[in-house]
UniProtKB/Swiss-Prot annotation:
Subunit organization: Monomer; also part of a multisubunit complex that groups tRNA ligases for Arg, Asp, Glu, Gln, Ile, Leu, Lys, Met and Pro.
Motif ('HIGH' region): 201-212
Protein name, entry field: Arginine--tRNA ligase, cytoplasmic
Domain-related comment: The alpha-helical N-terminus (residues 1-72) mediates interaction with AIMP1 and thereby contributes to the assembly of the multisynthetase complex.
Binding site for L-arginine: S200, P201, N202, H211, Y384, D388, Q412
Bilayer-spanning residue ranges: none
CDD domains linked: ArgRS_core
Gene this protein is translated from: rars1
Family as reported in the entry's similarity comment: Belongs to the class-I aminoacyl-tRNA synthetase family.
């Protein structure tokens, strides 16, 4: 939850007070020159230097925070909550943790925001044997609202709903600030180290449609946390270790005996994997050799490590093709990275008396978990449980993570909760201090509402899905005649923007907790809540000023000089929608549900359409088509809308184009 602005301002005030105090202390120390012959003089000089150093640091910090605060977008909802929190505290000081319920109003007649706390406070007072109606409570809250620049007026409706009407002057100035400074993130109280574990395919297997969700959702979460200013580590927890590498190395030795000196031409690693698996299942001698290869690999025998690296490199190159298509940045850190750390993890659990032996296995029962974690198999080998525990410990203790987010399918929910619980039990982290969360997601379904498969029943390869998206998006653009008006370069840019944008948006626009139906026809439809509709809307908005011969430089200059007029109801509605962007982002930072951003962008686009249909931005002579009037205030509202949409697209990993 973002801290209210009052806390931030109080922090600045405290810093300013401390600066004055430190300055006075330095002055006092300067006046102590007469004690030069005493032994304490050197100590006083040292203290003086420390105070000066601290003073300079504080001044620099203060200037940076003021500069950042002045440019940042304001979370209006949070500020209204702060105002009403103050009012409720003044009206009912005896209440601890009084409920704060502030939401945007659904209808203009109920103002711009509503505070619905009175009903809940009635119940709290009733429990204290005080019988007061919600309307009386609302009235008392209203009388205690502090002076502020946001709220123009309030009125009480129904049983005790408080309708909040914003100052148009305040809203106008916030739009101007956005236009001058660009779309800036809301101020965060503390920059944190955030580790996001996502994508995570297995070496020697192709990425399939199931990897799409983790990859797209994880990337978008990273983009959001990066935008607001956190230090994000994007990790690809590759499946690059295990017994399957024994059969792959044995097959490599047979098929490419000179692999140590000549790079083997493994064109299709999936087929290579299937061939080795077939031999492993059918040939006992091959199976024995495969197990021997596993032992050699675990002992880190150089030739076997080289073979393992060759196989991993082939896979990584194939994965990178997909990451390049989807514009995904990620650091590979597979299970192999944690192998040497697993021994220490097992030892730590044993030393703390947390290990039980079950049929030769070493298991751990985390609190509240009925299924144990197996940290050592009966044959002495480690498991995925051991690997995940080692990864958790490394991220907490070596990476110093303040937050770890695992973007893994919901089928792993019990396993992830067991791992987290074990981490708490052994004392690696305190959930009150460190946020560790499983951002689970449902499966991708075909239009038959069954798991998405090819006609032959195979899992859909992700690269094939992306290629099909490119093909269909080009067909869609040609159906609209865009190949006749766009240059070859513009057409190619539009094709990739629509193809990959639609695939990502179709996923992100659904609540990640639910399964979703994959349909190219629906995602490429330019009507409704789709990327196609939003991308077309964006290019249309961007073209308004261009067709009026107004350059970006003209708009930027006008933003500093032009007052934003919000007299028409559609101007007012659009401005409020634009300024809700920070509160939308804050909600997603809290719950990691990205469909909220998609819903907001769709609402913004449809609200803009209402505005554009009712408010002339550029007036032309009906006979000649010549421009007779440009409403710069409205053009700036267009520009602000496009700027917020562009930043929303960026967080979703979608690349809009200027022409489509």
């Amino acid at each position: 939850m973002e801290l209210p602005v009052c806390f931030y301002e109080e922090r600045l005030r405290q810093q300013e007070t401390e600066i004055k105090s430190l300055a006075a202390e330095i002055e006092r120390l300067k006046n102590c020159g007469f004690v030069s012959e005493t032994p304490s003089l050197e100590g006083l000089r040292e203290e003086n230097a420390k105070l000066k150093y601290r003073l300079n640091i504080l001044r620099k910090s203060l200037l940076e925070e003021k500069k950042k605060s002045s440019k940042s977008m304001i979370n209006i909802n949070a500020q209204i909550q702060e105002i009403f929190g103050t009012a409720i505290g003044a009206a009912y000081p005896e209440l601890q943790n009084a409920p704060l319920a502030v939401t945007p109003s659904q209808q203009p007649k109920f103002g711009d925001y509503q505070c619905n706390s009175a009903m809940a406070i009635t119940q709290m007072l009733k429990a204290m044997n005080q019988k007061v109606s919600p309307r009386e409570i609302a009235d008392k809250i209203v009388k205690n609202i502090p002076t502020n620049e946001l709220v123009e007026k309030v009125d009480i409706a129904g049983p005790g709903f408080i309708n909040v009407h914003l100052h148009k002057d305040f809203t106008s100035k916030q739009i101007s600030k956005l236009l001058v400074n660009g779309v800036q993130p809301p101020v965060i109280w503390e920059r944190k180290k955030v580790v996001v574990d996502f994508s995570s395919p297995n070496i020697a297997k192709e990425m399939h449609v199931g990897h799409l969700r983790s990859t797209v959702i994880g990337d978008s979460i990273c983009r959001l946390f990066e935008f607001v200013g956190h230090d994000v580590l994007r990790l690809n927890h590759l499946g690059d270790w295990g017994t399957q590498f024994g059969m792959l190395i044995a097959h490599l030795q047979d098929k490419f005996p000179d692999y140590l000196t000549v790079s083997p031409p493994i064109g299709d690693l999936q087929s290579f994997y299937k061939e080795s698996k077939k031999r492993f299942d059918e040939d006992e001698e091959f199976k024995k050799r495969a197990y021997q290869c596993v032992v050699q690999l675990q002992n880190k025998t150089p030739n076997f490590i080289q073979a393992w690296n060759l196989i991993c490199d082939v896979s990584r190159k194939e994965f990178q093709k997909i990451y390049d298509c989807l514009d995904i940045s990620i650091i590979d850190r597979g299970e192999s990275f944690y192998q040497d750390r697993m021994i220490g993890v097992v030892k730590e659990f044993e030393e703390k008396g947390l290990v039980q032996v079950d049929e030769g296995r070493k298991v751990v029962f985390p609190p509240g978990c009925s299924v144990p974690l197996t940290i050592v198999k009966s044959d002495g080998g480690f498991t995925y449980d051991t690997s995940d525990l080692a990864a958790l410990k490394q991220r907490l203790q070596e990476e110093k993570a303040d937050m770890i987010i695992y973007v893994i399918d919901s089928g792993q929910a019990i396993h992830m909760q067991n791992v987290f619980s074990a981490g708490r039990m052994i004392g690696w982290y305190d959930p009150k201090v460190t946020r560790i969360e499983h951002a689970g997601f449902g499966v991708v379904l075909g239009e038959d509402k069954k798991k998405f498969k090819t006609r032959s029943g195979d899992t859909v390869r992700l690269i094939d899905l992306l290629d099909e998206g490119l093909k269909r998006s080009m067909e869609k653009l040609k159906d609209k005649g865009r190949d006749k008006v766009l240059t070859a370069e513009e057409l190619l840019a539009a094709q990739t923007s629509v193809a990959f944008g639609c695939i990502k948006y179709a996923d992100l626009s659904h609540n990640r907790m639910n399964d979703y139906i994959f349909s190219f026809d629906k995602m490429l439809d330019d009507r409704g809540n789709t990327a196609a509709y939003l991308l077309y809307a964006y290019t249309r908005i961007r073209s308004i000023a261009r067709l009026a011969n107004i350059s970006d430089e003209d708009l930027h200059k006008a933003a500093k000089e032009t007052e934003i007029i919000l007299e028409h109801e559609k101007e007012w509605k659009l401005s409020k929608c634009i300024l809700r962007f920070p509160e939308i982002l804050q909600k997603i930072l809290d719950d990691l549900l990205l469909h909220t951003l998609c819903d907001y962008l769709y609402e913004l686009a449809t609200t803009f359409t209402e505005f554009y249909d009712n408010c002339y931005c550029v007036e032309k002579d009906r006979q000649t088509g010549q421009i007779v009037k440009v409403n710069m205030s409205r053009l700036l509202l267009c520009d602000a809308t496009a700027a917020v949409m562009a930043k929303g697209f960026d967080i979703l990993g979608i690349k809009p184009v200027q022409k489509m």
